[in-house]
Structure formats: C-alpha cells, structure tokens
C-alpha cells in the first residue's frame, strides 16, 4: 500500500502523503488505549481485542472497492516480469550504491528500538509511576492521538518543504527535530508523574513518532527504481519490525527481568532509558542520509532526476 503513494503523488508531496497515510499508527495506538481505558473495566481485555480486530476487518472490506493505480515509470502495456533472483540483485545494488538509502533504513531500524521497548510503557506507568491501569490508558491515549496526528501532518508537510528549499533531503529535517526532541525523551523518564515534563514528554514522544514516517518512507521510495519500489518498501517495513521492534521488545524484556532479579527499584525506568539512548543512533544516520540524498538520487535517475 505504501509503495502505491509514489504512483499517485508527485515527489514534492510524497512526504505529506506518506505522513497522512501513517496517521493510522497513532490513531490505532490511541484507539487501543482509549478502548482499553474506557471499556476494558466493563467488558474485559478479551472483548477489547475482539472489538479492535472487528473494526480492522470492517475497514479492510473497503479495500475491495479501491481501484488500481497505473505505475509511474513502468510500462503498463508490457509490464516487466522480474525473477526473484533479479529482484534481490537490484535490491542489493540499490542498497550498496546509495548511502542515503542505507542510512535511512538503518536510522529507521535504530529509531524503532525504543518503540519495541515501549511495549513496557504501561507497566512502567503502573508499577513505577503509580497510575491506575485504566486511568493511564485513557490519559496516554488522548496524548497519543493529539501528538501522533500532529506529528504525522507536520512531519510530512515540513519534510517536503525542507527538501524543496534546502540542499539536503528530508532525513536532515529528522536530524534536527530529533536533536530538539531527544532531551525531552530522556527527561520525562526521570521525573515524577506530577512534573510538567511528564505529560509533555509523552506528548512530544508521539509527535516525534509521527514526524518519522513521512520523511523516511518518501525518501526510501525516491531512492530506488520504480520497478522494485514495492519490494524495497516491504524490505524496509520488514527491517523496522523484525530488527528494530524485535530487538527493542526482546532486549527490553531481558534487561527488565535482569534488573528486577538484581533488586533494582525501577527496572522499567532503566530499561526504557537504555533503549531511548540506543535509538539516538538514528540521529547521525539521518544526518548522513540527508546530506547524501540529492547526490544519490541524481546517480539513480541521471542528472535530470525528476523532482516534480
């Protein structure tokens, strides 16, 4: 689905389109928290899962009525049929010849370390910050909705504007926003729940999550040949989930259990701080990706690279 956006939108609007598409993430996260917070005490957690799954199935039915979009840069009359081995060869070539693409993907994976570890956020809220489960689910749900939607819209739109008006690509926009927001990501893990930095940190965390999607997914799509765009986007999503989230949630669980066994008073605080810092590896990677973007795109498409 994500790769279809490059066929429907020009390059100058691709970041906003990707950010708008990925508003589904904060909306979904917020909806799950709000349903758990408001309905969980009444209907139980199993019924909440069934309700959320049913909503997803109903929305998926609408895809049956969505028409296909002609592929840009691909001959619709004579579509090219690539063997799996050829696709892998082109994918490997695209990665090795484009530092911007490699750094964008690696930066996205690093950014997802904390998203995986954030699976323990609700335990942290309850066990180490003294919240009641339903109360914090409702509270964080509203913050997730507001921050996530704002971040997605701003990230896509401002990322597009950045690339149009500066000599660097959209990842450089993420470099600067990450530098600005990272101190808040650390600070709110250290303060008590009644400190203003606590709610602000949760809100800005979801803003930062929203800022990520538009610039990175549009960058990945612009740095690969159209004929394997869907494959590369799929590889990127696989990397984010299998490596980024996988390391975050598995490593986070191991570290939290270890800290608990050692008798540490706040094992989840330490765990989440460690993975917050690890996720900051994305910052220098986005800097390199932003600096290299235009040169790598020109190499891919030639000096007359289309920048619609």
Predicted segments with their positions:
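Intracellular juxtamembrane helix-capping segments at the cytosolic ends
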Residues: 1-9, 211-224
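Cytoplasmic helix-loop-helix junction between adjacent transmembrane helices
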Residues: 1-25
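Helix-loop-helix hairpin linking two adjacent transmembrane segments in secondary transporters
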Residues: 21-68
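A membrane-interface helix-boundary motif in multi-pass transporters
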Residues: 41-53, 169-172, 256-279
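Multi-pass alpha-helical transporter architecture, strongest
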Residues: 62-65, 184-190, 273-306
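Juxtamembrane intracellular "pre-TM" segments in multi-pass secondary transporters
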Residues: 71-103, 128
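Extracytoplasmic gate region of multi-pass secondary transporters
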Residues: 99-153, 209-213, 217, 245-252
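Cytoplasmic membrane-interface "Motif A"-like loop-to-helix N-cap segments
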Residues: 161-177
